[in-house]
Amino acid sequence: MALNFWKSSHCQQWIFDKTEIWKQRAEDMKIYNEEEYNRLNIFWANFITAVATEGAHSQANVGCKLRQQVIATAIIYFKRFYLRQSFRDMCPFLVASTALFLACKVEEHTTLSVSSFLKNTAIVLPKRWGVTFETTSTKNGVVYDSEFILVEILDCCLVVHHASRPMFELLEDLKQFTQQSTIANQPIKDLEAIEAQCQKVANDSLRCDVSLIFPPHVIGLSSIMVAMELMGRGEELEAWLVEVDTDFEKVTDCVEQIYKMYTLWKSFDEKEEVKKLMAKLPKPNQQPPPQQQHQHQQGYHL
């Protein structure tokens, strides 16, 4: 595993600028405008989270509750897949379920049955959004085929560096700074509450494109800044931020994108609007997406 982000496939192959991201989505942008696509970003993340966490309470009892890191990895797989493919190429509900299945393996979570994800999808979609999940088959082979396609489209780059790790390292640095610095008025209080709010913001950031644009440490620092502002405690960071060595132009951009996502999410009536967005979703091709033109090395890229 590539412990060094800067040498990883995540850094070298899966960080883009905003203009490039929208260019790669050109086929889907013939159907959706930018605001609609951003609403879809929120929906897909919510859907993947729901499939992973809510099915356990269903009458079919086929649910599964996954660790947040597994969910985050699955969401990023999904985002990466649809940078290289359009919704017409492969059913996004199937891709989302497959991304969860693959993320369980990569994050060394207990591997759940394929049928659990398919059944959870069929239960959660109509229950929460009034949308029916349709597929030509519910046999395990369907998901195993889609897993192969997903791995190939991702160039076998399956290790994802999340914002949580650098974020908690930065929070520890903040704690030490406020305890030792003569500049800070007093040690920071309610650290557990701050950590929880920061983690929530980091999780929520998966509902926009920051994971495709910024390194994890930028998202981590941005999550801290947004979380503290939401708690009404932003001024407590001022002295510490002066000491942080990073590209604050990128941090400012990331913070703005997270706030824009929250503004859009607040106005997003999912129960009503998702049906309209799904009505525009093109029917997937019968054939699987075209394979990459170049040859892939065997094994997973780290």
UniProtKB/Swiss-Prot annotation:
Keywords: Activator, Cyclin, Developmental protein, Nucleus, Transcription, Transcription regulation. It is found in: Nucleus. The keyword Nucleus applies. One of its GO terms (cellular component) is nucleus. GO terms for molecular function: cyclin-dependent protein serine/threonine kinase regulator activity. Residues 281-302 are annotated as: Disordered. One of its GO terms (biological process) is positive regulation of transcription by RNA polymerase II. Residues 46-152 form the Cyclin N-terminal domain. Residues 292-302 have a biased composition (Low complexity). InterPro entries: Cyclin-like_dom, Cyclin-like_sf, Cyclin/Ssn8, Cyclin_N. CDD domains: CYCLIN_CCNC_rpt1. The keyword Repeat does not apply. Pfam families: Cyclin_N (PF00134). Belongs to the cyclin family. Cyclin C subfamily. PANTHER family: CYCLIN (PTHR10026). Component of the Mediator complex. Component of the Mediator complex, a coactivator involved in regulated gene transcription of nearly all RNA polymerase II-dependent genes. Mediator functions as a bridge to convey information from gene-specific regulatory proteins to the basal RNA polymerase II transcription machinery. Mediator is recruited to promoters by direct interactions with regulatory proteins and serves as a scaffold for the assembly of a functional preinitiation complex with RNA polymerase II and the general transcription factors. This is Cyclin-C. It comes from Caenorhabditis elegans. The gene is cic-1.
